[in-house]
Amino acid sequence: MLDLIAIRRQLHQIPEIGLEEYQTQAFLLSVIEQLCQDKPFIQIKTWKTGILVFLKGYAPEKTVAWRSDMDGLPITEETGLAFASKHQGRMHACGHDIHMTMALGLLEALVEKQSKHNMLFIFQPAEENEAGGMLMYQSGALDEWMPDEVYALHVRPDLPVGTLASNRATLFAGTCEVKVSFKGKGGHAAFPHHANDALVAASYFVTQVQTIVSRNVDPIEGAVVTFGSLHAGTTNNVISQEALLHGTIRTLTHDMSQLTQKRLTEMAEGIAKSFGLEVDVHLKQGGYLPVENNPELADELISFFKESDTINMIECLPAMTGEDFGFLLSKVKGVMFWLGVDTPYPLHHAKMSPDEGAIKQALPEIKAFLEENIED
């Protein structure tokens, strides 16, 4: 039987950023191959630094998938743990070490006997920075074993151990990176009529885009448009020739994201025209679409866990953070849910340290849920 706490601590010590998870992949493969040896109904293959484990059913009518992300973050750990990161400037500060450990625990349970339906375990690299889920899907890595349903979890620091949370709609917002460049004509501050001030135009733009949320977005759906960076000019008495803005869009549905991107682009072009400037708008959503749970499958999952005597299943509001599982859910119906890990520090914090008791508490119930899905 796997020592899941020891496994989690080993994974925690070797965090690697997206598409560089070589040591992580090697460690996972060593455990997976041990679990799957002498099991002729199981196939294993790799994709870049990711891993796919396929459990063929004896009379399959569907394929159910479980996805775990693998990568760490470029953060210097400050937990003081005896098993802290051994990789300088790298940390599992988003709980992906817990995610991988849970997946291995589920795999160990489900390889004991061949089930009726197919089961696919997806160990996915590069969730944090490269939209690895989208890359994996678009490369055709899943084509041979394309799932009909897919499930995943994410640790949540502010929920107690033994609590799971989800909803029947959107769990994570979709994110879109925005870069806008206004180009005008520089000049002396004393002669603005001989110049064309890009900074003034950019200032108008930042103010005007706030009306997208207040006047174009359905208040029930919600959205965020934030510009966290504006760079223009070099000194106090020179009019800026160029202004560069860098921001983000967060929305709870893909349709709302498309609307917000459209209105932002129209505003940038309109302001540029009114000031006689050139403008370039670059929008990058990549694979970070909203995590939109399938209502029917979410209802089944929530109802199942609410029957548990050991798990507290609650229904929650969406989070405005992003997750690349949204891309896979745009292709395959499925559900993501939160796993409470009870720590005072938030995700991506250098001191974030999940309570390992969450693994033992939740694993049997999640195993039972998957077993019901692949045996019905």
Swiss-Prot record:
It catalyses: N-acetyl-(2S,6S)-2,6-diaminopimelate + H2O = (2S,6S)-2,6-diaminopimelate + acetate. GO terms for molecular function: N-acetyldiaminopimelate deacetylase activity. Gene3D superfamilies: 3.30.70.360, Zn peptidases. CDD domains: M20_Acy1_YkuR-like. Pathway: Amino-acid biosynthesis; L-lysine biosynthesis via DAP pathway; LL-2,6-diaminopimelate from (S)-tetrahydrodipicolinate (acetylase route): step 3/3. NCBIfam families: amidohydrolases. Catalyzes the conversion of N-acetyl-diaminopimelate to diaminopimelate and acetate. HAMAP family: DapEL. This is N-acetyldiaminopimelate deacetylase. It comes from Streptococcus uberis (strain ATCC BAA-854 / 0140J).
